[in-house]
Amino acid sequence: MNRVVLIGRLTKDPELKFTPGTGTAVTTFVLAVDRRFSKDGKNEADFIPVVVWGKQAESTANYMSKGKLIGISGRIQTRSYEAKDGTRRYVTEVVADEVKFLEWGNKQSSGSQGFNNFESDPLSYNNEDNYNDDITPVDEGEVPF
């Protein structure tokens, strides 16, 4: 089984490219993922390279920017290539098949616009709703178990 699920922040704006010939969108970025605190109490992070293909690649590049919180799931993949100096280079990266934007906002916006920011839209959260009014009583004699 090769499955990875990560939540972290973009270290810089995603880079969108298109493959020659087919024109398939591919976006690359580095995700900073917090680790548990070290023995001396300092917070540490791992920096994970991520690749996204297709429509998700375009959406990620268009709507995400440096510092935004993002969740991804996918697989770890290793590959190698020959560098310009003739040496063989090896790369380990996550190929994401699912991307979740945990903070919204285009590249021009500033500040956090996360899902949990109820103050920005007071209609999105109302703790005065009484959902118990919608419950219909059930005669326990009618329940088959």
Curated annotation (Swiss-Prot):
Q: Which InterPro entries match?
A: NA-bd_OB-fold, Primosome_PriB/ssb, ssDNA-bd
What PROSITE patterns does UniProt report for this protein, alphabetically? SSB (PS50935)
Q: What is this protein called?
A: Single-stranded DNA-binding protein
The UniProt record lists the SSB domain at: 1-103
NCBIfam families named in the record: ssb
Q: Give start-end positions of Polar residues composition bias.
A: 112-129
One Pfam family this sequence matches: SSB
Oligomeric state and partners?
Answer: Homotetramer.
